[in-house]
Amino acid sequence: PNPPYNDFLRGNGYNVENPWNDHANSGLSDDGERLSGWLLKNSDLPADIEEELSETPYMTQRAIDFMKEAGDQPWLCHLSYIKPHWPYIVPAPYHNMYTKDHIIPPVRSEEEKQTNHPVYGAYLKSRICQTFARDDVRERVIPAYMGLIKQIDDQLGILFNWMKQANLFDNTMIVFTSDHGDYLGDHWMGEKDLFHDQSVKVPLIIYDPRKEAKVSEGRESNQLVECIDLAPTFLDFFNIKDKPHILEGRGLKEILHSNEDPKDWRKYAISEYDYSTRQARHIIGNEPDKAQLFMIRDSRWKYIFAEGFRPMLFDLEVDPKELHDLGESQKKIHLNAKKRLYDALFEWARKHHSRTTVTNEEIEKRTGKEPP
């Protein structure tokens, strides 16, 4: 593939076949040897690229270009910064802004390391988790990861200042979020594949310029919100009627335009993951079509369903760091929580998720009538 970013870099003097790989995501040794950022041992090197030409500033400028081209017409811009992400390497001056002294201790326990849960245990045996469980790897990678985050912070400042100068800031909703988190050694894990909060509890910061949102300015809500809630939120912002037969989410205006959380908000949040391509599936010898994981949580409990294996359960009130798996507990309170959450997950799974062409109103009109 030849993405536009490679053309951009070649146009700025990086005349190699793949400057994204060889410059934006590689460093140099003291003797000039090119060292790949895909290798974690090179994460402390500065990427061999001018900072203003690296990926994150490039994406900021593309967003600005998009807004300029849109002019006065309504628009929606999905500015998807790829970083922080593999390869974990960042250009100067961000590569050495942070050191191992800035790293907080990992959230993990010996009890977790000795887990008898087949899927979790298989992950802990996988190469990526074995790697990120090492302190020397964390001490090399996390400072670069923090540098990548700091670069995004700075670029958002540049973007917002431009929007203010262009008179866009006061009529544009801004949502800052992510698709997932990263374990970085917490729970002896790497990457994103299970359902601890390090992976699934992502930031969600919303700036709503409408006067009705002033009442919630600076407020933090503890309601269970899912990424699928964003699409109906955007439709509402543009005064477009929601299509609940297509979109499963619930718009967030009730939260944004009130100083109190709604009383009838959802009771559960759900996440799902297919680990069929991950090394863990091979370790436990599972079939691809059985490699499904589901998570359902409420305000206190988190329940993880692994097809073919026992569940996991965490009491977030007593154990907010999720260090003690209660999936095998026979205590009544735990049995009740497991049954209730399993039943709620099964109810969700039985819902009709595929009828996306006809509204409920149209269904009512057609009910009991012979087809034409």
Identify what each model region corresponds to.
Residues S126-R140, L148, E307, L326-P372:
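Long, internal low-complexity/basic segments
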Residues P1:
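His/Cys-centered metal/cofactor-coordination and adjacent catalytic loops
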Residues F8, N12-L224, F237-I246, I333-N336, ...:
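Active-site-proximal cap/lid insertion segments
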Residues R62, K201, E226-F237, G251, ...:
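Generic recognition of well-ordered alpha-helical segments
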Residues H180-D186, E212, I228-A231, D236-M312, ...:
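C-terminal cap/loop subdomain of S1 sulfatases and analogous C-terminal strand-loop tails that border
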Residues L76-L79, Y98, L204-I205, F234, ...:
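A short aromatic-rich beta-strand->coil structural motif
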Residues P106-V107, V215-R219, K243-I246, W265-Y268, ...:
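Short, hydrophobic secondary-structure boundary micro-motifs
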